[in-house]
């Protein structure tokens, strides 16, 4: 199932008909907000407000691991994440689909596989964005 993660400026999707909100507890704690399950133009989707609903979590306070685990537990197979960021040359309001990434997520846990009983997993990060979703 496709999931959307909304960032600052997108704590809700106006056309999403919410059928259920899942309060999910993960081994990493609670996600930023309940996972909303519903339909968007007749397509079943999930939605999670990255900073909470209402917006209460600053970027360094977001429990990213709990967010990802909650979406997985709810049946997510693909994620489209929406972010508000500054730019260098694109005009304000431009939609940008990134091809590569600079990872500035230092200073926080960087894996979902931290239990000694977890499988040994190496993620190929050379092309971090799914070409089908792009």
Positions of PLM-derived features:
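Metabolite-binding pocket within alpha/beta catalytic cores that recognizes anionic/polar moieties
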Residues: 1-127
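Active-site rim beta-loop-alpha module in soluble metabolic enzymes
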Residues: 126-134
